[in-house]
């Protein structure tokens, strides 16, 4: 089985590490292993996508600066044909409306709960419909 291609975006290396640790080498036992692609800047992420990369899931930090993951999520959904599912990480539960605006399929809040993140990611990789947390 081919590895699941997962993009992780955050300007904060500790946030990227938390996300990657939560995902582990395989998000769930019924899914293939992960291949993680880390990005600290929106321009690097867009160059990767524009280069024709096949991606199964985007996990984007909405608290990144100067370019937040919510805006990038919206741009991906607007510009990428058959865009992969997007999971955004917001600063607080009350920001769920921003996650909805971004057209992300799912959202979780900081601080990252590894179990919630892994479950949401697994559901999206399986093609399940997920709502904001």
Annotate each predicted stretch with a short phrase.
Residues 3-24, 58:
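Conserved acidic segment of CheY-like receiver
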Residues 20, 55-77:
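Conserved phosphotransfer microenvironments
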Residues 58, 107-108:
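Two-component signal transduction core modules
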Residues 50-53, 77-82:
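Conserved phosphotransfer cores of two-component systems
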């Amino acid at each position: 089985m081919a590895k699941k291609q997962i993009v992780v975006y955050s300007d904060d290396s500790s946030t990227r590490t938390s996300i990657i640790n939560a995902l582990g080498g395989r998000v769930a036992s019924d899914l293939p292993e992960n291949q993680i692609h880390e990005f600290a800047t929106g321009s690097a992420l867009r160059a990767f996508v524009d280069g024709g990369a096949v991606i199964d899931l985007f996990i984007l930090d909405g608290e990144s600066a100067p370019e937040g993951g919510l805006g990038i999520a919206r741009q991906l959904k607007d510009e990428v044909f058959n865009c992969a599912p997007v999971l955004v990480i917001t600063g607080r539960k009350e920001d769920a409306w921003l996650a909805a605006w971004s057209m992300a399929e799912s959202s979780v809040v900081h601080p990252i709960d590894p179990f919630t993140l892994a479950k949401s990611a697994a559901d999206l990789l399986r093609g399940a419909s997920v709502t904001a947390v």
